Amino acid sequence: MAKKGNISSRNLRISDQIQKDLAEMIQRELRDPRLGLVTLQSVTLTPDYAHAKVYFTVLGADAAETEAILNEKAGYLHSLLFKRLHIHTVPTLHFHHDTSVEHAIEMSRLINEANATRSKDED
């Protein structure tokens, strides 16, 4: 997932609006039973607003399959965004599974395991 360091306030506002609109559209417009519970984590835009990386997590479905489905439906979602957003360029959407949550869970598990081992060694 990209950092929001040197990004213009306009870029951030548009990213946030795209994230909100896409989250609603995925829930209401995409009625694909293969999709699980999709949560959009962030949207990062290129400086020219031509491309948007949309990072998501999913529960109840395979992440790779969900990514493929979302990228397959990206054109449809783009057309819906075009109708909602009042900007000159609506970015091309690129969906990516966000693995940072899984990494955080794994790191937490490893820390807890190390602490448990240390406690046993001290006893």
Swiss-Prot record:
Signal peptide: none annotated. Keywords: Cytoplasm, Ribosome biogenesis. Its main location: cytoplasm. One of its GO terms (biological process) is maturation of SSU-rRNA. It is found in: Cytoplasm. This is Ribosome-binding factor A. The gene is rbfA. Pfam families: RBFA. InterPro entries: KH_dom-like_a/b, RbfA, RbfA_dom_sf. One of several proteins that assist in the late maturation steps of the functional core of the 30S ribosomal subunit. Associates with free 30S ribosomal subunits (but not with 30S subunits that are part of 70S ribosomes or polysomes). Required for efficient processing of 16S rRNA. May interact with the 5'-terminal helix region of 16S rRNA. Disulfide bonds: none annotated. The lineage of its organism: Bacteria, Pseudomonadati, Pseudomonadota, Betaproteobacteria, Burkholderiales. SUPFAM superfamilies: Ribosome-binding factor A, RbfA (SSF89919). Monomer. Binds 30S ribosomal subunits, but not 50S ribosomal subunits or 70S ribosomes. GO terms for molecular function: ribosomal small subunit binding. The keyword rRNA-binding does not apply. It comes from the Bacteria. GO terms for cellular component: cytosol.
